[in-house]
Amino acid sequence: MKVKVLSLLVPALLVAGAANAAEVYNKDGNKLDLYGKVDGLHYFSDDKSVDGDQTYMRLGFKGETQVTDQLTGYGQWEYQIQGNSAENENNSWTRVAFAGLKFQDVGSFDYGRNYGVVYDVTSWTDVLPEFGGDTYGSDNFMQQRGNGFATYRNTDFFGLVDGLNFAVQYQGKNGSVSGEGMTNNGREALRQNGDGVGGSITYDYEGFGIGAAVSSSKRTDDQNSPLYIGNGDRAETYTGGLKYDANNIYLAAQYTQTYNATRVGSLGWANKAQNFEAVAQYQFDFGLRPSLAYLQSKGKNLGVINGRNYDDEDILKYVDVGATYYFNKNMSTYVDYKINLLDDNQFTRDAGINTDNIVALGLVYQF
């Protein structure tokens, strides 16, 4: 019986971090769910900057309120707290925080810190036990989590076509800490963005999925400084993906092409980058889920770095072999081996890109 229950629970747990949420309140059209996890995590690597304790905790809530028969209000907040640092260090941050309204079949609109629409497709490969999803990053235009997202989403195409979903999104400027490009939440140039727009469309049918997403953001003056490579008026992203999720098998792949949007270590952005991620997983009925993945990000026509001219270089390239074992819906353990395929050379040293392998061991409690 336990084996059969695990085979049903594990796929649900992988859909979203809040899939296993604890219901705190549900009365008179108001609902509040609390979710979170504690990951006792350790890295083993020759790279001393990551080797060691990586323990962290995430905590969040999702709430809904029934305004009318046709209108529902909702909100979500998620926070991460590092458990590997001293108590006097402020190593915690908000991952998402947004509120919105859903108009039955018409769609939903929300605003706040949220995921960019590009992640509607690239999230399909961001399912590895620990690593993965790093051909892009947070606060990187509209590629993943970011600030100031206004998002319209429509599920099942106005209730007419099951599985056909689309989204349209706008992101406001997040600029510098001072000067003409200053905004109230200013940050370093590598995490800034100008006004941006994007959209996504996905279709799921009997376990098969296909999707595409695009985004285009104005770049800030700081980002076009001579201090950085990859200057340009706009940062653009074009992505497409496929997935299969049925019969205990999960397969997914995505290809993304970016212009002035993929970060090159701490040096800036690639004028053009080609990013590819692919993953294969199988869920055994007794709780074991092995995983195999390949990820690569290749920068094109990078330009001059520290007085040296670089053309085409791999920014990221590795094979990932891992496995997760689910004791039950609340407890799991995993191992994830990142086999780095990058060579230690002048480019990686100039860009500050890690070329060492990493083994991650984790023990997770989630609710």
Swiss-Prot record:
**Signal peptide positions on this chain:** 1-21
Task: Write the protein's name.
Answer: Outer membrane porin C
Question: Where are the disulfide bridges?
Answer: none
Compartments in which it is found: Cell outer membrane
Q: How does it sit in the membrane?
A: Multi-pass membrane protein
- Species in which this protein is naturally found: Escherichia coli O157:H7
Q: Which UniProt keywords apply?
A: Cell outer membrane, Ion transport, Membrane, Porin, Signal, Transmembrane, Transmembrane beta strand, Transport
* GO cellular component, as recorded: cell outer membrane; pore complex
Report if keyword Ion transport is assigned.
yes
